[in-house]
Amino acid sequence: MTNIITVNNLFFKYDSNQTHYQLENVSFHVKQGEWLSIIGHNGSGKSTTVRLIDGLLEAESGQIIIDGQELTEDNVWELRHKIGMVFQNPDNQFVGATVEDDVAFGLENKGIPLKDMKERVDQALDLVGMSEFKMREPARLSGGQKQRVAIAGAVAMRPQVIILDEATSMLDPEGRLELIRTIRAIRQKYNLTVISITHDLDEVALSDRVIVMKNGKVESTSTPKALFGRGNRLISLGLDVPFTSRLMAELAANGLDIGTEYLTEKELEEQLWELNLKM
């Protein structure tokens, strides 16, 4: 699997007069078609990293390669078309008077012919389940609906990568799961690469890989299963301890020790059934 994004030795600070770097010698890669989660405490450098990838910020030094091209001042607008970004607060992204207008906005700026534009808008709204709201004012939508429209606007541009910058953090648990399912379906349909900045365990669990950032550096890269196996140490990374890990600890405290390796809910259920049959 080829790398769609490669980050080499990034250094960045918001104030050139400061000695402290927000990002210090950050390197990693993102494979084409994978779902990569980036986690860490507030101030760890997660959002700064993806803003550098999207060209919203400029690194002091280092290299960002997107789809085989190094990101520079000359090609930042060209490469930005390969990336769709959805932020925490969708209200900050709305520019159209209606949902349909808002999704079409980026396509108009790109000079997409009217017929193709209407087709893309309809397809994108259908994908996120918002077709019936296309004439609605964005301000009258719920938080989850607004995020769906923001995602539709990104998908309509046909990017290769979608970056979710804590896009589910303001939603209730049900809305969060619905949005994650939507992103998952879109990813499969278009073979999109997803980069997710998140604190949500359900999002992390869907990832192929997880990068942990700490104090502006990459602390570790692992699979979700390996990460969840860190148990109570996850709290220091800004995550909750997974339900299955907490349940296994409770069971062990009551005399039913089934090991310390992290198990998914399905794996734990199967393990408990096996133990039950042996009793």
From Swiss-Prot:
Give the E.C. number(s): 7.-.-.-
Annotated PROSITE patterns: ABC_TRANSPORTER_1, ABC_TRANSPORTER_2, CBIO
Q: Where are the transmembrane segments?
A: none
Question: Which cellular component terms (GO) are annotated to the entry?
Answer: ATP-binding cassette (ABC) transporter complex
Q: Which Pfam families match?
A: ABC_tran
Q: Which GO terms describe its molecular function?
A: ATP binding; ATP hydrolysis activity; ATPase-coupled transmembrane transporter activity
Binding of ATP: at which residues? G40, H41, N42, G43, S44, G45, K46, S47
**Compartment(s):** Cell membrane
Q: Which family, according to UniProt? A: Belongs to the ABC transporter superfamily. Energy-coupling factor EcfA family.
Listed under subunit, the entry gives: Forms a stable energy-coupling factor (ECF) transporter complex composed of 2 membrane-embedded substrate-binding proteins (S component), 2 ATP-binding proteins (A component) and 2 transmembrane proteins (T component).
Task: Report what the protein is called.
Answer: Energy-coupling factor transporter ATP-binding protein EcfA1
Q: Which organism is it from?
A: Streptococcus agalactiae serotype V (strain ATCC BAA-611 / 2603 V/R)
Q: What taxonomic classification does the UniProt entry list for its organism?
A: Bacteria, Bacillati, Bacillota, Bacilli, Lactobacillales
